[in-house]
């Protein structure tokens, strides 16, 4: 056999080994709009059949509500899948963690019946820490902006990611290492922030004493999650990733600067967990049957009228994290086409269809136009351009009957089915599930 043939076979063997090294795939649940689409409920439904559920980015600025066995759980840092006692929950390296909030969240949910968390929660040693002074800075920066505030949650997420990007952040693993080194780094990062924000007051010694206690509390949960996840994939374990926030809040692809400080699109899954692209299986886009957003920023289909009020009231549109009323508007197809382009949805879960039950007609945005009437063939890249567009709507007939008790797609009113099919045809993405209520039992399997 010639050397070239041998080399070719050698290459093919190695190449085949690389392409077949994982026995399972990672399925991903991502918000397709501005958040609050109902991702937690979808994750809760899917988590009953998986081995591992992961958070990959964001912090306790996210808010997910899950109803399990009649009990309502609110999660901010913990993955929603933690209610399933058979699966392991992972907080990945891309997440920023405020330890006081994490342990408060654990206590509150344990009081509601969450059990045995110590055996099934894993935290990455590479995840960065959010400190109280990050939160103070967040509030101060928002206050300084006055009427031009970004509407952040003031949870310190942006300042913590800033510390990470400027390479003076502190990771969980450093808290668990030599505490003298941690103390030095902590004093250094405090000094930097005091220099930039002289009005913040940090009792360094008190904070160090507090974090010495947190080191002992968090130690049992901390692992190299990258190694853990790759081993799991090689062994055929099923993994589900729960994206926090949503595509239109992504630091790169969202309505910048009215965005969060992390990548909440598909790229953040890879960098936030240390996974290669070939591990990704299903990408499930969660779409609310109408559109909402919390805080400031452009919102082309917003309804500042009776329709907006009705959606807000019927949908109980109040932020889990901020307690602010959510702004409400019609479903936006150009926005969804854009986020589908970025994320590559393989299927969609449409949520809160029941909120539209009382409407005689329903509008859906189908195109954006420039002021001169010319249709846009792309999603605007600046808020100035987005704020200057006109929206073209399709008007669909409503169904004016309750869908809350329906559990079979074919039993939905014909016009409700048509609404779902319209979304499918516009996006060329199949709708796999439709939600018509709060609990996991209210999710209809379409196919």
Swiss-Prot record:
It comes from Drosophila sechellia. Transmembrane segments: none annotated. GTP binds at residues 35-41, 63-65, 326, 352-354, 435-437. PANTHER family: ADENYLOSUCCINATE SYNTHETASE. This is Adenylosuccinate synthetase. Its main location: cytoplasm. Belongs to the adenylosuccinate synthetase family. Keywords: Cytoplasm, GTP-binding, Ligase, Magnesium, Metal-binding, Nucleotide-binding, Purine biosynthesis. The keyword Zinc-finger does not apply.
